[in-house]
Amino acid sequence: MQKGCLHSICISPQRGQLKQEVPEALVTDFGIENDGHAGDWGRQVTCLNWESVQQVNKEKNMNIGPGQFAENLLIEGLDLKQLKVGGRLKIGADVILEVSQIGKEDHPSVVTRTLGVTLLPYEGLFCRVVAGGSIKKGDAVEEVQ
């Protein structure tokens, strides 16, 4: 099973906004506390690979940071592209997320209007919370059964 670490945690109070990085967060049954995407649906938490953000920065000569693709979690060192729907990630001591969707419809969004480039429609992992708890930047992330 793959292992990596939590590069960053990002939230926004409402949908349709770029997210701001926070050092730690509480993950509840419905998503990340104080995030506009938390709710009783399958896309409670959004994950991206930090390496993908770095690749866009290199290819486009940009300086995109955490939250600017509207992701909640940037994962480093674990290839999220290897996960399938139903796959699970454990973050820190307690949090377990299950992949409910990979990618989404590519539509004009705050991300494309602001940056001119997007990743979530192609690489975003949309997850539902299986088990909640506290997470912080630097926590271990591993693929689990």
Task: Give residue spans per PLM region.
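Metal-cofactor-dependent catalytic cores
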Residues: 1-145
